[in-house]
Design a protein with these regions (language model features):
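A SIS-like phosphosugar-recognition module
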Residues: 1-157
């Protein structure tokens, strides 16, 4: 994810990591950053998720990466989450997920809908691994409510 969708990609990775108690390695990147290293670890167990922007110019670059990945496929799966109709996406993606929000939206607002896909994937993966999503880390390394953090008073200067 890029710009406003970078946060969605980051939260997607974090949620999957959290709900699978670290048994599923995750990462996020921009389409440019992904080409410079992370793409090299893709194997037949990998699901790559691409979030497409509603910005027509930006979407061209995002689709270029999806096309590149589809043509270099190594048995991995590709999911593409998008709002508007996207010609040819069904042939490129194993899981074309269209979340029709309607009119063009700012990426930040699209993210509110797009994150539901990631949360569902994380939940289903957690259950498939026999991990309880309500308490994925019973040993306490990761807690639902962060512990051990002190909130210090802040004075506006």
């Amino acid at each position: 994810g890029n710009i406003g969708l970078k946060g969605v990609a980051q939260e997607s990775a974090l949620k999957t990591l959290e709900l699978t108690a670290g048994k599923v390695a995750t990462m996020y990147d921009s389409e440019l950053g992904f080409r410079h290293g992370p793409k090299s670890i893709i194997d037949d167990n990998t699901l790559t998720v691409a979030y497409l922007s509603d910005d027509e110019y930006r979407r061209r670059y995002e689709l270029d990466l999806v096309k590149e990945m589809a043509h270099q496929r190594k048995g991995n799966k590709i999911a593409v989450v998008y709002n508007h109709d996207c010609e040819g996406i069904e042939e490129l993606a194993d899981y074309p997920i269209q979340i029709k929000v309607g009119a063009d939206m700012e990426n930040v607002l699209l993210g509110l809908d797009f994150i539901l896909f990631a949360q569902t994937i994380a939940l289903m993966k957690s259950l498939s691994l026999g991990i309880t999503p309500d308490n994925p880390c019973p040993t306490g390394e990761v807690n639902r409510v962060v512990k051990g953090v002190t909130l210090y008073p802040y004075t506006l200067k």
